[in-house]
């Protein structure tokens, strides 16, 4: 029969093993993960991303958004890339992604090129994470060191995509809680929202705002947006999220908010007399502060619940399970 001391030691040993296992799981994400197994992986991904963005500047925003929508559902596991099958209800068909999520082909192209030099080594989850970083850099935004070693999921969740992703009509408190549930601070949330310095939105997402005659929108801005977004029909018409420099990653997005020229309701709530006004003001005055915080927040987002070690797989094709 174990004595109390022996029992305590046994429990302590088990706890230590569990703690070590957890630490090793996180330690498996490393910037040097592919240095020996696929040293040219990052250059190969960068080439694919740059080619895509040189053909269509908007693709930079699409790739950053794709990474964001991946990480917020099951973690950064490339689940958003999986196609519909009898056993997989694809996240592509979820309302936040249907008809708006783009860049799948770019990730597949990058994966195909990487497979040519290192078959079965680099995950789609890592390719998507690196592509988001390279997309930012390609349009004048910050770059950062990406930790690598994620593995790919064998499942997807349309349900979680429809419940966990923040929406364009969300009030500030819901945005804050949504990001907090993923381990991201309010400051992270505001910085990541700054990705709307590039990209476009469909008419039906901002129609109510520009026809509301509300006090939180500049009348001239609303009038300009109405030209391409009538009160009825033309739901898919696009408008830039940043009307001033729509293809350049900068801090004009925050300057627009101060002028009540945020396109989406979820943009303008960041500067509307609430707790995030001071952060928006700071970023509007300092492109350096925004750039630094955006990079830091992207790194944190890339750490959301990754599969590593023996968990998950390395997909051969990003849209399907091996």
UniProtKB/Swiss-Prot annotation:
* Top-level EC class as recorded in UniProt: oxidoreductase
CDD domains in the cross-refs: secretory_peroxidase
Provide the GO biological process annotations. hydrogen peroxide catabolic process; response to oxidative stress
Question: What would you give as a GO molecular function for this chain, any one?
Answer: metal ion binding
Q: Name the positions where heme b binds.
A: 196
The note describing how and how many cofactors are bound reads: Binds 2 calcium ions per subunit.
Record: residues binding Ca(2+) 1: 70, 73, 75, 77, 79
Instruction: Tell me which residues bear Pyrrolidone carboxylic acid.
Output: 28
State the superkingdom.
Answer: Eukaryota
> In which family does this protein belong, per the annotation?
Belongs to the peroxidase family. Classical plant (class III) peroxidase subfamily.
Q: What does this protein do?
A: Removal of H(2)O(2), oxidation of toxic reductants, biosynthesis and degradation of lignin, suberization, auxin catabolism, response to environmental stresses such as wounding, pathogen attack and oxidative stress. These functions might be dependent on each isozyme/isoform in each plant tissue.
Which PANTHER family does the UniProt record give? Answer: PEROXIDASE, PEROXIDASE 72-RELATED
Name of this protein: Lignin-forming anionic peroxidase
Q: What is the lineage of its organism?
A: Eukaryota, Viridiplantae, Streptophyta, Embryophyta, Tracheophyta
């Amino acid at each position: 029969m174990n004595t109390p001391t022996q029992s305590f030691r046994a429990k302590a040993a088990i706890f230590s093993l569990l703690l070590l296992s957890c630490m090793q799981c996180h330690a498996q994400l490393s910037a040097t993960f592919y240095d020996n197994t696929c040293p040219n992986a990052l250059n190969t991904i960068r080439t694919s991303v740059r080619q895509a963005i040189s053909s269509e500047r908007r693709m930079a925003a699409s790739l950053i958004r794709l990474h964001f929508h991946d990480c917020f559902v099951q973690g950064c596991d490339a689940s958003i890339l999986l196609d519909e099958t009898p056993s997989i209800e694809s996240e592509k068909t979820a309302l936040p992604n249907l008809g708006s999520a783009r860049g799948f082909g770019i990730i597949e192209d990058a994966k195909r090129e990487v497979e040519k030099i290192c078959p079965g080594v680099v995950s789609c989850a890592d390719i998507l994470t690196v592509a988001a970083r390279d997309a930012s850099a390609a349009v004048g935004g910050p770059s950062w060191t990406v930790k690598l070693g994620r593995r790919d999921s064998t499942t997807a969740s349309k349900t979680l995509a429809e419940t966990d992703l923040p929406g364009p009509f969300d009030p500030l408190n819901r945005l804050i809680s949504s990001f907090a549930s993923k381990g991201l601070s309010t400051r992270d949330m505001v910085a990541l929202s700054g990705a709307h310095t590039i990209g476009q939105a469909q008419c039906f997402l901002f129609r109510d705002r520009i026809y509301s005659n509300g006090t939180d929108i500049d009348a001239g801005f609303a009038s300009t947006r109405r030209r391409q977004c009538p009160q009825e029909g033309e739901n898919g018409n696009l408008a830039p999220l940043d009307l001033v420099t729509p293809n350049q990653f900068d801090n004009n997005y925050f300057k627009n908010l101060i002028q009540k020229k945020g396109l989406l309701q979820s943009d303008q709530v960041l500067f509307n007399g609430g707790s995030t006004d001071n952060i928006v003001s700071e970023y509007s005055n300092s492109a350096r502060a925004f750039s630094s915080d955006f990079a830091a927040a992207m790194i944190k987002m890339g750490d959301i619940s990754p599969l590593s070690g023996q968990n998950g797989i390395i997909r051969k094709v990003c849209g399907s399970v091996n």
